[in-house]
């Protein structure tokens, strides 16, 4: 797997941005730590999917990674679930909450979908949502389940392009 990368470094002509380094990495684990932490700490990301009518749909999400894929967990039947099942191209934006000029945008494709009810792999979806709850709200198991039989779905998103901007705050 090869992931194209680009670092946006400074304003260019006519209020556009110039791209600095372009490169390639082989996996999310190869990202520079100054950006990888945006998907390893409790930063709320924004997921962009495409609706049936072609319009974008944005959702704040908790996010993780497995070294290769970005992990997105949701309730079966939600709009983002339906969109990712029908159209596998997505984008994820992670912005440093302390510095809005330090961010990472990831374009990718859904390569695997695991429903909690899958007898072979379903525990991955349950484990992931519980790990996210521990990281983001310091509690486990995930406490916000719909008591009417909610089924969680874990989407594995394979990055195809990563754009980064700005250094993290000093200190």
Predicted region positions:
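Short secondary-structure boundary segments
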Residues: 95-97, 159-160
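Short, basic/aromatic recognition patches
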Residues: 18-46
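Short beta-strand segments
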Residues: 42-76, 84, 91-95, 103-106
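A generic structural signal for nonpolar/aromatic side chains embedded in well-ordered alpha-helices
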Residues: 38-39, 84, 132, 157
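Charged, gly/pro-rich active-site loop segments
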Residues: 1-29, 102-171
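Short, surface-exposed beta-strand-loop junctions and turns on beta-sheet-rich folds
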Residues: 78-80, 99, 171
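Structural motif corresponding to alpha-helix initiation and N-cap regions
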Residues: 32, 77-78
